[in-house]
Amino acid sequence: LAYEQTKEGVFKEAALHQVPSFKERLIKRIVVDHHDMGFLYTPSCVAAYKLTGDKLARETALMAADNLMGRFQDRGEFFQAWGKLGNPKEYRLIIDCLLNMPLLFWASEETKNLKYRETALLHIRTSMKHVVREDSSTYHTYYFDPETGAPLRGVTAQGYRDGSIWARGQAWGIYGSAIAYKYCPNSMYIESFRKITACFLEHLPKNLIPYWDFYFTDGSGSPRDSSSAAIAACGMLEMAKYLEPEEAKDYIKTAKRLLKALTKHCLYRSSEDTNGILLHSTYAKSSPYNTVKDSGVDECTLWGDYFYMEALVRLVAQWEVYW
């Protein structure tokens, strides 16, 4: 993103310098037995190839796509997020994985192999069918029967409890439904986007910086998750490209409001103490009802910084999306 906007070689070289390590990670199997190949390899290697034609970046991104394909479960038609394949305790998808699908769409376009695309579409359909509740809030994760593939139940991992609204999960739903429509222009994804976005906006506190879970409201003193607002803004700006002008204008206006709030309340304005950009993100917050330990609470996060920058770029440039 920095190189695209400035054309300064220092940013380009710093990014390309990372590509060999991304390939090495796959070859040596360094924490790659999970679904997050798109998050790792789309804004790095796919972006590098699109912008510079770097052949190693292309090769590495295709390796990552193949690694992700290995996690697809035919019984249930979804990508298993975590754990040993087929383990009943981990036979589930998570809403985050919608952002991993563009890696497969890119691989399909790049290789002319439709299997990548077809598999991504199956996962998207399964996800949107099961993680979105009747009130348009979302589950973080959803379990399936490993023997039959039948849907079982929605539960949380990083949210406050199973029935609450994990803020970042809701934001993934916003961006994920926009991406779904980009690659499969079915009106049902626009309708899902509208409803998921409305639910997100209805639960925002006064200063527009989401609490880590929407169970919490103003006065609770609970940590925020600024990254959720940045992700949601990106999703609104993406979907605006496919909507009628008046509706698109409303979502663009809302995205700008979120970004102004992030800039006012969360932008780190000093070069001391941290190399982060966006304060007040939360990776995982423990609760009496979830399974995580406190990790990255009220800190800068890689994805918070990235999606904040992406949203800003979307506002100032005709940007070719990495996703």
Name every feature range the model reports, one short phrase each.
Residues 1-323:
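Glycan-recognition and catalytic cores of secretory/periplasmic carbohydrate-active enzymes
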